[in-house]
Amino acid sequence: VAAAQALREIERLACWSVKQANLTTSLLGDLLDDVTSIRHAVLQNRAAIDFLLLAHGHGCEDIAGMCCFNLSDHSESIQKKFQLMKEHVNKIGVDSDPIGSWLRGLFGGIGEWAVHLLKGLLLGLVVILLLVVCLPCLLQFVSSSIRKMIDNSLGYREERKKFQEAYKQPERVV
């Protein structure tokens, strides 16, 4: 019962984490789009300022801090990380056949028919082992129970005979 509850809790947490990862990815994607549009607007404004300065005969040297302008772009690495995050989210799931997965991992790329065959053989082996372990105990229990029933039955018959003999009235001759 505790294992089933723990499994349900793990499934619930996995579902919750997938939903949170999807929401986070969506939110960060929207923020990246906003940053990209803001970056584009800043670059357009900088180009307009440079154009106006040049139109009035001034260069960037005339105003302190206007010559150096660094606006880094990390959108490509962020997109790669989004893709990686989505791949990890897609890997989250419930394994409905843990024994089959274990066998596939153990024996490599075996076919489904081989997995079913190995699962059947494994089940048969477990049943045989259980019989080998439990059968002697079960036979001893049944044997002792039958012996007790027979002893009780024989003891009851002997007691009955003794009782009848003890209370047997002599026959009257008429």
UniProtKB/Swiss-Prot annotation:
S-S pairs: C60-C67
Membrane topology (Cytoplasmic): 143-174
Parts forming coiled coils: 4-54, 72-102
Record key words, sorted: Cleavage on pair of basic residues, Coiled coil, Disulfide bond, Fusion of virus membrane with host cell membrane, Fusion of virus membrane with host membrane, Glycoprotein, Host cell membrane, Host membrane, Host-virus interaction, Lipoprotein, Membrane, Palmitate, Transmembrane, Transmembrane helix, Viral attachment to host cell, Viral envelope protein, Viral penetration into host cytoplasm, Virion, Virus entry into host cell
Extracellular side: 1-121
Keyword Glycoprotein: yes
Transmembrane segments: 122-142
Family label: Belongs to the Alpharetroviruses envelope glycoprotein family.
Stated name of the protein: Envelope glycoprotein
Species in which this protein is naturally found: UR2 avian sarcoma virus (UR2SV)
Gene: env
